[in-house]
Amino acid sequence: MRNNTVKVLTIQALIAAIYVVLTIAIAPFSYGAIQFRISESLSQLVVFSKKYWFPITLGVAIANIFSPLGIVDVFFGTLGTGLALAISIFVFKFVKNRIARHIINIILYLVICMPIIAYEITIFSGDNSARVPFEFGSFTAIYGSLLLSQVIVMVIGIIITEALNKAIDLKKVFE
């Protein structure tokens, strides 16, 4: 029992670390209104097991410490990711087809996580922090930019996780 706990924690720590490294390695592109966070492709791992939820969410929290928005990004980014992945995991109880799960995961990210991040960036970035009535135009532009990059990295995530699953059974990694 103890060996399995150590194994699970080690794997989760490695996944969180990979997320952080992939984010920080391309830091200028990982944060802000126009971002391309390749580490988000790891979010497709929850399709295989709910045990991937914690390391991905933890990776987001740690990576966002280095964001220009700091603790604000830690809060909103972790909230958005954690919520989107948790709802995906819940929906997966009713959906067994892996490709359908991947698509559902993308859709839930786009409608749950990305609006939270777009709101955060609209309110707390640069000159926008002084704008008290919420600027819907800014939000829409930021949301559109995030949407496009998120779809791209999540599709990359499908390709990577499906290829990886052929080599390593991603459902059984934690066993």
Where are the regions a protein language model picked out?
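Hydrophobic transmembrane alpha-helices
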Residues: 1-54
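Small-polar-interrupted transmembrane alpha-helices in polytopic inner-membrane proteins
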Residues: 19, 56-64
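Membrane-embedded alpha-helical hairpins and interfacial helices in multi-pass inner-membrane proteins
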Residues: 28-33, 61-79, 83-175
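Membrane-helix interface "capping/anchor" motifs
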Residues: 46-56, 93-101
